[in-house]
Curated annotation (Swiss-Prot):
Claim: DNA damage is one of the keywords in the record: no
Gene3D superfamilies membership: P-loop containing nucleotide triphosphate hydrolases
Lineage: Eukaryota, Fungi, Dikarya, Ascomycota, Saccharomycotina
Residue ranges constituting the Helicase ATP-binding domain according to the UniProt record: 250-446
One GO molecular-function entry: RNA binding
Its biological purpose: ATP-binding RNA helicase involved in the biogenesis of 60S ribosomal subunits and is required for the normal formation of 25S and 5.8S rRNAs.
Positions of the Helicase C-terminal domain: 501-653
GO CC annotation: cytosol; nucleolus
Residue span of motif Q motif: 219-247
Keywords: ATP-binding, Helicase, Hydrolase, Nucleotide-binding, Nucleus, Ribosome biogenesis, RNA-binding, rRNA processing
Protein name per Swiss-Prot or TrEMBL: ATP-dependent RNA helicase MAK5
Primary location: nucleus
Length: 796
């Protein structure tokens, strides 16, 4: 029998349609068309079947473990494709599908509802594959179709109106399955038995070391027992020696100890827990069991951790690209569920708690799978376990722990004792989480009076996490909360001049700069402000879609590489969504547009620079009101523990002021003012348009008329709208300001405007211009570096 069924939807019997001989678009132009006698195909329609309730093939409803109460209903059964009618007070069940009726021993069930009778003389089975145009056939599709069973031929019969998202998802699923089958482009041999054997042992024999030279990494191999695969991956990435946290934690983790690790930002904590998990993955001979589960507080950090581990794992193993898998919100949950069903996928999971809990609730069958893990990791654990952030994680631990106790053994080993737990962060101090604008600085603990700080934090964490044994505490940065490679500085200004001094810093010290703001509106406004000044800037914040965040990060990295070659600045403006864990190479400066709300946020913000062995600069832009309040408390918390005499060091002298040049600031002031007005106009216009669209859409959904007077009666909406309208500019005024700003941008900046001649003064401007030396943006100014300036080296 012949059916016109798409290969990707052959399981959906609703897509079955009679084959039509007049569909020219399904027949190849390069092949001869063979006519099919219309009378040779006869459609035999099925009839309605009336049955009793006991004769139906009911399916039981499984109660998921994620539901504490199911309303008292248990033992429920359900069935699809059955109509219910009441005739003369009697209930009748009517179905058209014999599958819904229980089979009798002597009955033979038909496979399809529509049966075609064919005339062998008029129809040739081999030529029915011609229904698809050769221009639409993709590479390898014909060979894949030829491997199907002889009794079925899959030919697409989807109508043009039915194409779209469904066909797109099916094509994506097909490509994903091809990637899972062979990422390295392996050749399938005729001996299917040998092929299956190789696939089943793919992790146990991951590298052919006969043709590979062993990497020379003595500092790694002498201090810890690592496999050839990991050493080769580290060598390819250029990691010739371990960092302090890696040197102390990896040997203990390989032995199965629980670890609580504290290290400064950029010190390699990801590989400190990632390498032991990869070693477990290499030694494990199974192909479906999940080995490790890693939780991160943000989506961007989860994708970054996944990328780092994949670079170590896949450098020598071109296998399944989904072996190390990230599960985060903002991306298609259906795609993530589909990938988890592939063989060998999800051996190591990197997830955010919210999306992971959602997956467990949607598919309870995943709970026993992830309950078999060997290692649980909490990256940036202090953030995950703060009050208000722990509810989702607590539910996950409860579900996995309950399922783990039910399982008796894994490969003959008892599983009730729990899993290995590793928690890492750069901040483990309870004082760091206090709000700087609400806590009195007098009650903060003094420097040097907290010798057992890590023990206190551990006792706090053990109330929330059930460790199978007490963790080993590893603190590689006990004296400093902010790494010593970060040089801190301060700019004091009026609250309305923050934009001006951001612009000054960028022009004076061009490079790759990351600017942090406390509010999303400030991120949007500052991004528009810098774009008006012709500066390459990008933004990421929590209101953006996840794909847009990742896209902006990629654009920022690409643009920074281009601008660094010509000495131009590249700016990334972010809310605190990017403060933790993100490892963006080349960040020279971190600007705090607003003072952070807590000390731990400041530490993680500053840690986006000075990654690895590099040094960086962290600059706070602070108003006078902040200086006497939050700034004082921040410096009190961050003061060095083991200072020889901490009371004699005033908090005002703890952070040096950034040197400013008033003549340069005065030249930038007018530019900044105009750019700020244009940015306010742009943001207000977009916001008003968005509000109007939202109100219209809400009125349409409620089927009511939108009354403008009702909006005026609402004082909050009216005040907000008036505030935005006051920031808007007329079209002519907007054009005039843009023209004025462009003219100002064409004028070069000069170090000293009082000079009448190029060759006058201490600096020969003519010589500087001819020889192309000196500052790229300021004529007569030497090239300056913020790091060297703060180190004490004077530049003219």
């Amino acid at each position: 029998m012949v059916y016109g069924v798409s290969k990707m939807a052959n399981k959906n019997r609703k897509n079955l349609k009679p084959v039509k001989s007049d569909r020219k678009d399904r027949i190849s132009k390069n092949h001869s068309k063979k006519k099919v006698n219309k009378n040779s195909l006869k459609k035999v329609a099925t009839t309605d079947i009336t049955v009793n309730a006991n004769e139906l093939n009911w399916k039981s409803v499984d109660i998921p473990d994620t539901l504490d109460d199911f309303g008292g209903f248990y033992g429920l059964e359900e069935i699809d494709g059955v109509d219910v009618k009441v005739v003369d007070g009697k209930v009748q069940f009517i179905t058209k599908d014999n599958k819904n009726v229980k089979k009798e021993p002597e009955q033979v069930e038909e496979k399809d509802n529509i049966v075609f009778q064919e005339d062998d003389e008029d129809v040739n089975m081999d030529e029915l594959i011609e229904f698809k145009n050769f221009d639409d056939i993709k590479e390898g599709e014909l060979s894949a179709a030829s491997d199907d069973e002889e009794s079925e031929f899959h030919v697409s019969t989807e109508e043009e109106g039915e194409e779209g998202e469904e066909a797109e998802d099916q094509e994506e699923e097909r490509s994903e399955k091809e990637n899972v089958k062979g990422e390295a482009g392996t050749v399938v041999t005729e001996d299917q038995t040998n092929d299956d054997l190789l696939q089943s042992n793919v992790f146990s024999s991951n590298v052919d070391i006969d043709d590979q030279e062993p990497p020379v990494l003595p500092e790694w191999s002498e201090n810890m027992d690592l496999s050839f695969t990991v050493l080769k991956g580290l060598s390819g990435l250029g990691f010739t020696r371990p960092t302090e946290i890696q040197l102390k934690s990896i040997p203990l983790a390989l032995k199965g100890h629980n670890i609580m690790g504290k290290a400064s930002t950029g010190s390699g904590k990801t590989l400190a827990y990632g390498i032991p998990i990869i070693e477990q993955l290499i030694k494990d001979t199974s192909n479906d069991r999940s080995i490790g589960l890693i939780f991160t507080p943000t989506r961007e950090l989860a994708h970054q951790v996944t990328d780092h581990l994949q670079k170590v794992w896949t450098k020598m193993n071109k296998l399944n690209k989904y072996t190390i898998l990230s599960l985060t919100g903002g991306l298609s949950i259906q795609k993530q569920e589909r990938i988890l069903k592939y063989d060998g996928s999800g051996r190591i999971i990197v997830a955010t708690p919210g999306r992971f809990l959602e997956l467990l609730e949607r598919n309870p069958d995943l709970i026993p799978r992830f309950a078999k893990i060997d290692t649980l990791v909490l990256d940036e654990a202090d953030r995950l376990l703060q009050d208000g952030h722990f509810d989702e994680f607590e539910k996950i631990l409860k579900l996995l722990g309950k399922a783990r106790k039910i399982k008796t053994s894994i490969d003959g080993k008892p599983t009730g004792s729990g899993w290995q737990t590793m928690i890492f962060s750069a901040t483990f101090s309870l004082d760091l989480f206090t709000k700087l604008d609400k806590t009195s600085w007098k009650i903060l603990k003094t420097a040097g009076g907290e010798n057992n700080e890590m023990e206190q934090v551990l006792n706090h964490l053990m109330k929330k996490i059930q460790f199978k044994s007490k963790p080993v505490i590893i603190d590689t940065n006990p004296e400093h909360k902010v790494t010593s490679q970060v040089k801190e500085s301060l700019i004091e200004c009026l609250p309305m001049e923050r934009d001006l001094y951001v612009y000054y810093f960028i022009m004076m010290y061009p490079g790759t700069t990351l600017v942090f703001c406390n509010a999303i509106d400030s991120v949007k406004k500052l991004n528009a402000f810098l774009n008006n000044l012709k500066i390459s800037s990008f933004q990421i914040h929590s209101s953006m879609a996840q794909k847009n965040r990742l896209r902006n990060l990629e654009k920022f990295k690409e643009q920074s590489e281009k601008n660094s070659k010509v000495g131009k600045p590249t700016i990334l403006i972010a809310s605190d969504v990017a403060a933790r864990g993100l490892d963006i190479s080349g960040i020279k400066h971190v600007l705090h547009y607003h003072l952070p709300r807590s000390a731990d946020v400041y530490i993680h913000r500053s840690g986006r620079t000075a990654r690895g062995d590099n040094e960086g600069v962290s600059v706070m832009i602070c108003s006078p009101q902040e200086s006497m309040g939050p700034l004082r408390k921040l410096r009190k918390v961050l003061s060095t523990k083991k200072s020889s005499n901490p009371r004699k060091t005033k908090w005002q002298n703890d952070v040096p002021m950034l040197p400013l040049e008033p003549d340069i600031v005065s030249q930038l002031r007018e530019r900044s003012k105009i750019a700020s007005e244009l940015a306010d106009d742009e943001i207000a216009t977009k916001s008003l348009h968005k509000d109007d669209n939202w109100l219209k859409k809400a009125a349409e959904e409620l089927d009511i008329e939108l009354d403008s007077e009702e909006e005026e009666k609402d004082q909050f909406l009216a005040r907000n709208k008036t505030k935005k309208l006051n920031k808007q500019l007329e079209k002519n005024e907007n054009k005039a300001l843009k023209y004025q700003l462009n003219e100002l941008l064409k004028m070069p900046l000069r170090k000293d405007l009082r000079k009448s001649y190029l060759t006058g003064g201490l600096t020969n401007l003519a010589d500087t211009l001819v020889k192309h030396k000196g500052h790229n943006s300021i004529i007569g100014h030497d090239k300056v570096d913020a790091l060297q300036t703060l180190k004490g080296k004077k530049h003219k």
